[in-house]
Amino acid sequence: MLIIQGESQCGDVYLKTYRQGAEVLLAACDCDLMGKRFEDGKLHLEVCSDFFGTEKASCQDLEKALPRVTIANFVGKKAVDKAIELGYINKENILVIDGVPCAQMVMM
């Protein structure tokens, strides 16, 4: 079971932004997860630079980017905790794969 408490102590995350028409997607993951693969039954998660990028950013950068995006993917405790702290994700909607929290957001 994953327990997320209090204000996050966010360190470095990888951020990558994609634009397709009016949609802006942000991919955010904890730096320590890059290049790793996680499995939990039928669920598989591969954290790769092709999707999450190679540019390290701070959680302040993540916070500044979120108001401009319409879709976001968060992987890892730091990224997910920050999204919860800012009100973009509800704790109840987190998926945990092999101990790694993941969440998605879509603005409608």
Segments the model singles out, each with a brief description of its role:
Residues 71-108:
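Short, compact, well-ordered microdomains
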